[in-house]
């Protein structure tokens, strides 16, 4: 072995001794990265995400207009983690979490860790401490817009605090990203939408908290209401579109459409009818839906109700859909060539 190679090997051993195994490696040793994913709680969203759920050890941003279903999407993820025996935490910066609604969605509120911090700094320090513990499987911060810097809270009404929140988020994400990857915690940041002033062309919408979150997020979901669902004159829920605007573990720009029912969350039966009909697992003839020559009902709402009343049929349809897409619980996917970033046009602001 030449002196140069010997010197390099000694340097590599010294680096690994000081900083731990894996702190430096040859590029060819780790071209494919194994990423464990956990189901999102929505079959349609799992399909759109490509990998079958949310990746562990990554930052995820869920944003959209008010009352579009952002918190509902996050709560379903918490319920899925808890079903698998995982520990979940919710940092409620908006002080608006409804325990009754969370319970209806399948969240075990007795086991859910809840923090309602006073300042943005406090919220992010709590989040960092939980992630670094390595004992939390999913952490939700609701919302970035409500992470008010201490200086703004203690200042006078009308004082200008330009860029404070963006700097706070940038610093927090620099500290959080490495710890998140090591602890394999799923960190979900819920965010709101703001309008940029004076934009004549292009999309005037942006998200608070600066650009850092856009760059550090492996997955960004845009949640929007498409239409209101009615039964007679009563409004019972929303048809909601979830667009994957950034995805570093699978191809982006796919869309999932779900029914979010008031007080119940994402309608499992609605997803089974829609995806089942697309795959011809559920047959549609005119307005009638049927499965294995058994009629489910006339019209989508009646078919949904029939599935709700017959859980065995719903379970059979769900299993066939899961088998088709390979969505059977928590799994590991291989991320190839995760070079830089797969950014949406929204990131080029």
Swiss-Prot record:
InterPro entries: AAA+_ATPase, DNA_recomb/repair_RecA, DNA_recomb/repair_RecA_CS, P-loop_NTPase, RecA-like_C, RecA-like_N, RecA_ATP-bd, RecA_C_sf. Keywords: ATP-binding, Cytoplasm, DNA damage, DNA recombination, DNA repair, DNA-binding, Nucleotide-binding, SOS response. It is found in: Cytoplasm. SMART domains: AAA. Belongs to the RecA family. GO terms for cellular component: cytosol. ATP binds at residues 64-71. Can catalyze the hydrolysis of ATP in the presence of single-stranded DNA, the ATP-dependent uptake of single-stranded DNA by duplex DNA, and the ATP-dependent hybridization of homologous single-stranded DNAs. It interacts with LexA causing its activation and leading to its autocatalytic cleavage. It comes from the Bacteria. It comes from Exiguobacterium sp. (strain ATCC BAA-1283 / AT1b). This is Protein RecA.
């Amino acid at each position: 072995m030449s002196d140069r190679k010997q010197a390099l090997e000694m340097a590599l051993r010294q680096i690994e001794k000081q900083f731990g195994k894996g702190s430096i490696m040859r590029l060819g040793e780790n071209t494919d990265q194994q990423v464990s994913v956990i189901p999102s709680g929505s079959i349609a969203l799992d399909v759109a995400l490509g990998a079958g759920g949310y990746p562990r050890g990554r930052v995820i941003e869920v944003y959209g207009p008010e009352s579009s279903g952002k918190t509902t999407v996050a709560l379903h993820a918490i319920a899925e983690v808890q079903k698998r025996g995982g520990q979940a935490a919710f940092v409620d910066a908006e002080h608006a979490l409804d325990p009754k609604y969370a319970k209806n969605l399948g969240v075990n509120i007795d086991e859910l860790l809840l923090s309602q911090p006073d300042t943005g700094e406090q919220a992010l320090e709590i989040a960092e401490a939980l992630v670094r513990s390595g004992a939390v499987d999913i952490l939700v911060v609701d919302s970035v817009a409500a992470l008010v810097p201490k200086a703004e809270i203690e200042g006078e009404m009308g004082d200008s605090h330009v860029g404070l929140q963006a700097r706070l988020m940038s610093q927090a994400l620099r500290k959080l990203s490495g710890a998140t990857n090591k602890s394999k915690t799923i960190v979900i940041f819920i965010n709101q939408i703001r309008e940029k002033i004076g934009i004549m062309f292009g999309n005037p919408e942006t998200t608070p908290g600066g650009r850092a979150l856009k760059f550090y997020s492996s997955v960004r979901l845009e949640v929007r209401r498409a239409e209101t669902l009615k039964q007679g004159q009563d409004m019972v829920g929303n048809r909601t579109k979830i667009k994957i605007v950034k995805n570093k573990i699978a191809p982006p720009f796919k869309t999932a459409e779900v029914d979010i029912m008031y007080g119940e969350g994402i309608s499992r039966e609605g997803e089974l009818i829609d995806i089942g009909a697309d795959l011809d697992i559920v047959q549609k003839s005119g307005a009638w839906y049927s499965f294995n020559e058994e009629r489910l009902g006339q019209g989508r709402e009646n078919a949904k109700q029939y599935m709700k009343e017959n859980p065995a049929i719903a379970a059979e349809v769900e299993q066939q859909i899961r088998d088709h897409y390979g969505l059977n619980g928590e799994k590991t996917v291989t991320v190839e060539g995760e070079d830089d970033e797969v950014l949406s046009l929204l990131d080029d602001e």
